[in-house]
Amino acid sequence: YEFKQYFPENGWVEHNPNEIWSTTLKALKQVINKAKKLKGNILTIGITNQRETTILWNKKTGKPIYNAIVWQDRRTQDYCKLLKKKNYENSFRNKTGLFIDPYFSATKIKWILDNGKISKKLLGSNDLLFGTVDTFLIWKLTKGKQHLTEASNASRTMLYNINNNKWDKEILKKLNIPQKILPEVKNSADNFGKTDKKITGVEISISAVLGDQQSAAFGQTCFEKGSIKSTYGTGAFVIMNTGPKKINSKNKLLTTIYYRLNNKNTYALEGSIFIAGAGVQWLRDKVNLIKKASETETISKSSKINDGVFVVPAFSGMGAPYWRPDARGVITGLTRDSDWKSIVRATVESVGYQSFDLFDSMNKDGLKPRIIKAVSYTHLTLPTNTTV
């Protein structure tokens, strides 16, 4: 089920948490009803989710105090610049594996705390909670009994120390974020409670949680050190399993937790591209060059050569390996021979060029992939001359 995206200001991206919850519950009930018809039982469920997307809600009522600020959102760009001027980047990166960027949850939390109408009141009464989408869904499914997350999601907040597996008190202090609003961090496979019977009709245990990109790598069986998955959806994300050893990239890739089992981390290197399928959405919904996403494949294959038109889809800044939140989109190479199809093709090709940058960074870090597994959840078949 698709839910609406909101763009209240330039560079801002939001979701309605209640829509996230209602569509999730609708999908779950559909599966439960199907299982009943087949006379089967659902033994357990797992959750995979957008990782950095940030929600704060009222502990007593369960109502969000602001819309979910989505991972693509850029509103905290100036605050991130301030943190960099204070020379926090190296310290933050050594602890969290991340660069200071609006992409991650920490500065989004800070923004809601500073701008939410009832943030201070709820903090004072200990009635304010934070969570990424997994935490919010667990809270709702268990009817407020569990305030939990797991390691792969926690590692994307820019608040979690991936060396000692704890919320980092020094970073929290520097950002003035109270630890009491943060969830407990569990293993990726663990006891996350049970769904409330009044909500789902049956009690079902929740026994696994994993961030969406880590989950995609797990689903592609990237269990061996050096195995890579490259996923193309709204954004595009390349993850390499680096095993139990944390590797720090010299070429601006992220060091992150792949998963944690039995209190032991498996780490990964990740390159994040903010605009992949979202570029196709832009072609369809904003500039109206196509009516359906599927048209991009036919158009991209209609010509064997690029006619010199290039799109830099920095609609939400640039992710790895550039980390330029201030970057903006560019179309270049237009001539009188160029037409709308040139722009469509160039937008699709841009995903291939960005992917090359990520693989090139891994190569420069001296990391040789054992195998690359690519999967697309959108219409992003690259033209024949686009080499990754």
Question: What spans do the regions from the language model cover?
Answer:
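Short, conserved phosphate/pyrophosphate- and ester-handling motifs at nucleotide-, phospho-/glycolipid
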Residues: 16, 73, 212
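Active-site core segments that coordinate phosphate-bearing ligands/cofactors
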Residues: 77, 84-98, 103-147, 158-169, ...
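Short linear loop/turn motifs
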Residues: 182-191, 297-301
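N-terminally biased helix-coil "hinge/interface" segments that flank
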Residues: 1-2, 20, 24, 28, ...
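Short beta-strand-loop/turn "lid" adjacent to the catalytic site in phosphate-handling enzymes
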Residues: 35-71, 99-105, 134, 138-161, ...
